[in-house]
């Protein structure tokens, strides 16, 4: 059951809303939370019932581990809490590792050793990458003393809440629980329903009208790419088409998740904020899958960087040696993990490593500029200021770099990725493949790029209503040329109704799975 399906929009969602608010009115918020948790499990089971025991195990195990870790903290036994945390992490990561990476590891080992050993095909449980990271964050926060006093009902809802269960955002316990404990939780608020519906409608339109349309052009280009004839035009058409498909697909999902949660009176953290407007790779990663990057920064990068920086300082390292120890090593480790988190394949390994190199180049450039400005200040000269056209140049360079990594992200093999990438670099010539950009695809690409560059994103349209937990962090930043904000007046209602109507009409072409469901 997909968010972009008739059975969800006209069946499951209304039933879940009615059951939730009716239970809250007559039996109270705690009972309403139980009902919403059960609805979330039904939603999850609709895809593949056999995955439900894995999700339930993850919920029960991590709740119990969280309880004993928190108890150890209360008894002032930090070593005990740390040991319990290690046990919890080993179990969670072992579960993820078996289901997601066992086939990949065995296939590569047998290829190297020449063994004929085969492993039965392991089906990846839906959303295991997302809910595993969410549970890991909960356990680590419990060990750090950030989380305490967890109840089974509220944890069950936190761990299964269907709007964010399948593809994020990866939420922190501290972001959701205060809302579940609020006196207004499960109390019907027409404001939340309307705001949530508008956000959901915008996200649905991004998915059904734009992303799924682009998929019809992107998929044939990437099918057996290594066996096709490529040139510069065809290569960049494939890169741009998939890049915009992925952008609108994930942007649409992120909007729908926030909108659905808001209908139930819950605000989720922002997970997507116009990343293609970024003028650097570092800024891009601040805007793309924001909660995943937050997780990696807090639970991977910093635990590597802090001891590496201490080690560097103790040995008096400076210059490139200090940079390598304190920044390069943590960055490479973090982005390598980010790559393989997305998928078990060499294309994802390369995706992570290339992005690590991009980020390190960006860091070196920023540090170099800071050094120049420090020297200019000492010489009593005005510091270098980034001009408008320089920003445009950075933006174009960022998009150019992303074109290659998006190919890695989409290609089914390294050979396919290389076939397209070498064409994008001009190695296969210009016009040699006899490829001509279809007029309709050209118009769709131009219109989509105009929407991305010129129009406000959903958070900016709904800025007045604080659509996300952390929306205030981005308020007033990076205003687009054609700014418009939604209001609950006649124009606003007509806009929302028209967007929802068009989005639903486009569902009739077929219901495509969200791209991030594959991770």
Model-identified regions with their sequence ranges:
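Membrane-embedded transmembrane alpha-helical bundles that form the catalytic cores
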Residues: 1-518
């Amino acid at each position: 059951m997909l968010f972009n399906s008739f059975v969800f929009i006209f069946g499951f969602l209304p039933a879940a809303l009615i059951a939730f608010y009716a239970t809250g009115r007559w039996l109270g918020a705690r009972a309403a939370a139980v009902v919403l948790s059960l609805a979330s499990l039904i939603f999850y089971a609709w895809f593949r019932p056999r995955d439900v025991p894995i999700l339930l195990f993850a919920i029960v195990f991590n709740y119990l581990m969280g309880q004993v870790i928190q108890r150890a903290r209360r008894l002032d036994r930090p070593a005990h809490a740390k040991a319990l945390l290690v046990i919890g992490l080993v179990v969670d990561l072992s579960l993820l590792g078996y289901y997601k990476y066992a086939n990949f590891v065995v296939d590569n080992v047998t290829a190297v050793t020449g063994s004929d050993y085969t492993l039965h095909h392991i089906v990846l449980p839906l959303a295991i990458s997302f809910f595993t990271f969410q549970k890991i964050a909960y356990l680590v926060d419990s060990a750090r003393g950030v989380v305490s006093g967890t109840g089974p009902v509220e944890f069950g809802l936190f761990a299964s809440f269907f709007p964010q269960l399948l593809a994020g955002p990866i939420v922190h316990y501290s972001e959701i629980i205060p809302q579940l404990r609020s006196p207004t939780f499960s109390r019907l608020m027409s404001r939340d329903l309307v705001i949530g519906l508008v956000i959901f409608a915008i996200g649905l339109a991004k998915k059904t009208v734009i992303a799924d349309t682009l998929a019809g052009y992107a998929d044939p280009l990437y099918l057996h790419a290594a066996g096709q004839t490529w040139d510069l035009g065809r290569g960049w058409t494939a890169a741009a088409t998939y890049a915009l498909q992925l952008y609108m697909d994930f942007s649409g999902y992120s909007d729908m998740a926030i909108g659905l949660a808001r209908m139930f009176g819950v605000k989720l953290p922002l997970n997507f904020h116009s990343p293609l407007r970024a003028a650097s790779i570092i800024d891009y990663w601040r805007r793309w899958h924001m909660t995943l990057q937050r997780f990696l920064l807090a639970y991977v990068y910093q635990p590597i960087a802090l001891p590496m920086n201490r080690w560097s300082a103790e040995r008096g390292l400076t210059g490139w040696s200090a940079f390598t120890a304190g920044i390069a090593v943590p960055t490479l480790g973090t982005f390598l993990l980010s790559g393989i988190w997305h998928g078990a394949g060499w294309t994802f390994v390369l995706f992570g490593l290339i992005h690590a190199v991009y980020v390190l180049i960006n860091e070196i450039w920023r540090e170099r500029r800071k050094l120049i400005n420090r020297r200019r200040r000492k010489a009593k000269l005005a510091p270098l200021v980034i001009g408008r056209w320089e920003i445009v140049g950075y933006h174009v360079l960022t998009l150019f770099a992303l074109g290659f990594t998006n190919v890695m992200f989409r290609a089914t093999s390294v050979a396919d990725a290389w076939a397209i990438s070498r064409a994008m670099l001009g190695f296969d010539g210009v016009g040699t493949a006899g490829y001509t950009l279809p007029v309709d695809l050209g118009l769709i690409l131009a219109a989509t790029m105009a929407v991305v560059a010129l129009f406000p994103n959903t958070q900016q349209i709904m800025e007045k209503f604080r659509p996300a937990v952390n929306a205030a962090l981005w308020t007033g930043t990076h205003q687009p040329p054609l700014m418009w904000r939604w209001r609950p007046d006649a124009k606003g209602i007509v806009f929302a109704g028209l967007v929802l109507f068009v989005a639903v009409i486009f569902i009739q072409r077929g219901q495509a799975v969200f791209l991030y469901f594959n991770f």
